[in-house]
Amino acid sequence: MEEEKNWIAVPTWRIPCRLERWHSLIKYLKYRTKDLQQVSYVPHHKVGWAWWTCSRVIFPLKEGAHLEVQGYWNLTPERGFLSSYAVRLTWYERSFYTDVTPDVADRLLHGSYFSSFTANEVRRAIRGEKILSHCNYPSAHTGQVPSLQFLALRVVQEGKDGSQGESTTRKQRRRNSRRGIRMARDNIRTSQQSSSQSLAQGTYFPGLAEVLGILA
């Protein structure tokens, strides 16, 4: 008697293209800037028996938890979708795990990676002093109700005063965002661009949905 085939269904997020940009950005932040030095990057040839997995990126979080981004390829081959790619976002701690959405994954990552405003910045802003810290992961605050202090610091950081337009800091951070994506897309081919210039005020991370190109 032929054994019945068992299926395992997991939630995934469809992406429109391959994952080279994601892999390049992770390797850049892990090996070049050291922002993700503790992150484990597992390429497809080291994954093992899971042939449909093209990569695994494991982010250690606080209190022994982890966030894992698994990249899938060759999905649903029985329908001919041989070029389909997707990612799965999983949070787990010990024996418990659950799948999360990109916005939740961003908030989990921001709790352990990429700098944000410190507690002393509000007092510095009130005294008219220069803001010394910046939020390098603004997409992690999407969907949250921001505090008045956070909104005030964002206004100071981005230079929105209603008359002078964009400040130098805001323009620089927009350049940093574009530069980070461009460096990932180019696979860090040019050593001068990727090693001789450092990202101002820490490394800016645009968020999982933007880097991966997750389709809604």
From Swiss-Prot:
- Residues bearing Phosphothreonine are T98
Induction conditions: Expressed late during infection in a Rev-dependent manner.
| Compartments (UniProt record) | Host cytoplasm; Host cell membrane; Virion
Q: Name one Pfam family in it.
A: Vif
The record gives the membrane topology as: Peripheral membrane protein
- Output one GO BP term: viral life cycle
* UniProt comment concerning the protein's domains: The BC-like-box motif mediates the interaction with elongin BC complex.
Misc remark: Required for replication in 'nonpermissive' cells, including primary T-cells, macrophages and certain T-cell lines, but is dispensable for replication in 'permissive' cell lines, such as 293T cells. In nonpermissive cells, Vif-defective viruses can produce virions, but they fail to complete reverse transcription and cannot successfully infect new cells. Vif-defective viruses show catastrophic failure in reverse transcription due to APOBEC-induced mutations that initiate a DNA base repair pathway and compromise the structural integrity of the ssDNA. In the absence of Vif, the virion is morphologically abnormal.
Family listed: Belongs to the primate lentivirus group Vif protein family.
Function summary? Counteracts the innate antiviral activity of APOBEC3G. Forms a complex with host APOBEC3G thus preventing the entry of this lethally hypermutating enzyme into progeny virions. Functions as an adapter molecule, recruiting APOBEC3G to the ubiquitin-proteasome machinery. Targets APOBEC3G for degradation through the assembly with elongin BC complex, CUL5 and RBX1. Binds viral RNA and affects the stability of viral nucleoprotein core. May play a role in viral morphology.
Protein name per its UniProtKB record = Virion infectivity factor
Q: Can you name the source organism?
A: Human immunodeficiency virus type 2 subtype B (isolate EHO)
